[in-house]
Amino acid sequence: KKRGVYVAIVSSGVDIFVGAIANMLKVDDWVANGFEWDDEGWLLGGLPTRVLTHDKGIMVEKLARINGFKPSQIVSVGDSSTDLSMRIEGSKFIGFNPRRKRALEAFMEADVPVVEEKNLSLIWPLIFPGEEIP
């Protein structure tokens, strides 16, 4: 963020959890799926799906349009094969710490860079080649 990078979370997970993580990380924006609760706190059911697991690119495109970003300015980072759907035409994708063999295979097949360690600082040179982390 100090570099002026806009950070957003696009998750097909539950908004209560994603919102807490987004708040903790102080990201610029986030989107996830939610539930509807009654006045007594009982679960009524799921709300319409905002983020489709296999089509997260829809939300990436919306965030780009809302914020005036060109696809060439977007780098998505994900740990699962379904996260590859965030790679909209003209954008980049980095596979990060894939936990499943299927995810690693999908990243390799998609010919995207992959960081196999649980160290997020390792994506820096993939986003800013030749630069040190400030």
Predicted regions: what they are:
Residues 1-134:
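C-terminal cap/substrate-recognition subdomain and adjoining C-terminal extension
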